[in-house]
Every structure is written in C-alpha cells, then in structure tokens.
C-alpha cells in the first residue's frame, strides 16, 4: 500500500501494486534500469519459500517412521513419489542430481506461486503501516528476474552436462551437423541449433512469469474496481481457477527441466 494517509487513484493503486521494493526505490542505485538494481521483496520471498520447503522436508525426513505415518509424512511421500515417477519416465540418463533438483523446483515454484493467493492488500498494507515499507510485491514468480534466473540455472546445467557427457567435440558436432549432416550446411545448422538452444531458457522463464504475472494483475484489477466488501465475489472464483494454474505451471517447469537434462545426457549418435 501507499504511505499511511495517502490516497491512491484507481490507476495509481494498480501501478503501486505492480511496483517492487527495489534498491532504486530506496535511492541506493541510480535508477530502475541499473544492472545493480535488486528487487528486494522478490529476493526475500523467494528465499523464504525456499527455506520453508527445506525446513518442512528436512523435518519430515528426520522424523520419518516405518510405522503408521502422519498426515504430513504421507503428503511428503506422495510428492516425492510423484516426482520420482516422472523422472523415471522422462529422464533416460543416469544422474543422481536430477530427481532432487526436480523435487526442489516443483515444490519451490508451487510455494512461490501460492503467494498469489494471499489477499492482495494484506501484506503490502501491513508492511506499509507497521514497518514503513512503501512497496511490496509478494509473488516471486511474477517477477521476470526470478523466473529467468531459475531458467538460466537450468540452462547452465544443460550446457554443463551436454559437454560432460558428449565431450566438447561431441557437443560442437551436435550443433554443427544437425539436422543436416553435411559440411556445406554447417552455418545453417549452427543458426538453427543456437536459436533453438537459446529459446529453451527464454521460454522456460517467460512462460512461468507470464502466467503468474497475469494472475496477479487480475487480482489487482478486482481489488481496484470493486469495494472491499465485494472483492470476494470476483476474487474467490478466480482464486479457485488460479490454483490449477499454480500447480500446472510448477509441473511444466519441472517437466521441462527434466526433459532438457535428459536431452543433455543423450548419446550424441542417437
């Protein structure tokens, strides 16, 4: 929310809710376009949700019993089994990192996405009136910096394992001689393969960002256009539908990560 006592127009309300708490807003860097401008709120909530995932799963793992499990242990085991089954079906290489990575991505993205279901004014209003924080966006996955950082991390792993499994020569050969295995077509092959390669992290990060940002904008528009006592009329149906979006986007991000890493482990002569 805005500073206490400050009235906002409808357009001002929307613009305010789409503004991150950044170093530029605090006057610590020159402007919003600076390379060193960090979105503090997105970074904070992404780390917070990541730590929540680690704490819950570590606690369950430490207290796991072979007897009758509790509800939380059953839920965690269900999630782990679901991810493990998808990894077995999709990943055709041998790498002990892939399943834990897929589990981390799936749960972390879900937790970040779930922040979108918190009433739109609750945390920003509380932060403004109790902590004096003028701007607060609480959905990390609605920030392109977060989603693209995750996508680039997956991309870096894909390149690393492509070179490790196939060798630098094998990786270069894959780029230069596919899809047309003829020396004269190398420039054309390189153009196609490099574009295809760079499109992977771009589509991975932008898909998650686009869906979550759109969902956040709908909640903001509902809050801006309706009085507070009627907001639930529009927000509740959208929230129910949005739960499906939250889960699907986490699943898609996880599955594409597994697919990309599986491609990196493929036999170069496949």
From Swiss-Prot:
Keywords: ATP synthesis, Cell inner membrane, Cell membrane, CF(0), Hydrogen ion transport, Ion transport, Membrane, Transmembrane, Transmembrane helix, Transport. It is a multi-pass membrane protein. Pfam families: ATP-synt_A. It is found in: Cell inner membrane. The chain crosses the membrane at residues 37-57, 98-118, 143-163, 217-237, 239-259. GO terms for biological process: proton motive force-driven plasma membrane ATP synthesis. It comes from the Bacteria. GO terms for cellular component: plasma membrane; proton-transporting ATP synthase complex. GO terms for molecular function: proton-transporting ATP synthase activity, rotational mechanism. SUPFAM superfamilies: F1F0 ATP synthase subunit A. Belongs to the ATPase A chain family. Key component of the proton channel; it plays a direct role in the translocation of protons across the membrane. F-type ATPases have 2 components, CF(1) - the catalytic core - and CF(0) - the membrane proton channel. CF(1) has five subunits: alpha(3), beta(3), gamma(1), delta(1), epsilon(1). CF(0) has three main subunits: a(1), b(2) and c(9-12). The alpha and beta chains form an alternating ring which encloses part of the gamma chain. CF(1) is attached to CF(0) by a central stalk formed by the gamma and epsilon chains, while a peripheral stalk is formed by the delta and b chains. This is ATP synthase subunit a. The lineage of its organism: Bacteria, Pseudomonadati, Pseudomonadota, Gammaproteobacteria, Vibrionales. The gene is atpB.
């Amino acid at each position: 929310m805005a500073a206490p006592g400050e009235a906002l127009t409808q357009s001002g309300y929307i613009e305010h809710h789409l503004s991150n708490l950044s170093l530029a807003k605090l006057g610590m860097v020159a402007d919003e376009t600076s390379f060193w401008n960090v979105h503090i709120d997105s970074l904070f909530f992404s780390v917070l949700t990541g730590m929540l995932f680690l704490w819950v799963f570590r606690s369950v793992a430490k207290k796991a019993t072979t007897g009758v499990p509790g509800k939380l242990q059953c839920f965690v085991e269900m999630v782990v089994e679901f991810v493990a089954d998808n990894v077995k079906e999709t990943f055709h290489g041998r790498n002990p990192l892939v399943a834990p990575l897929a589990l981390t991505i799936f749960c972390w993205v879900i937790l970040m996405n779930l922040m979108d279901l918190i009433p739109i004014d609750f945390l920003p209003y509380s932060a403004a009136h109790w902590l004096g924080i003028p701007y607060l966006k609480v959905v990390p996955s609605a920030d392109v910096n977060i989603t693209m950082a995750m996508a680039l991390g997956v991309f870096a792993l894909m390149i690393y394992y492509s070179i490790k499994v196939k060798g630098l020569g094998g990786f270069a050969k894959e780029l230069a001689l596919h899809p047309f295995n003829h020396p004269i077509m190398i420039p054309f092959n390189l153009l196609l393969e490099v574009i295809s390669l760079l499109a992977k992290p771009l589509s991975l990060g932008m898909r998650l960002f686009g869906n979550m940002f759109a969902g956040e904008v709908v909640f903001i528009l509902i809050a801006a256009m309706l009085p507070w006592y009627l907001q639930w009329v529009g927000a509740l149906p959208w929230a129910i539908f949005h739960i499906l979006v939250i889960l699907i986007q986490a699943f898609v991000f996880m599955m594409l990560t597994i697919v990309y890493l599986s491609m990196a482990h493929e036999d170069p002569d496949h």
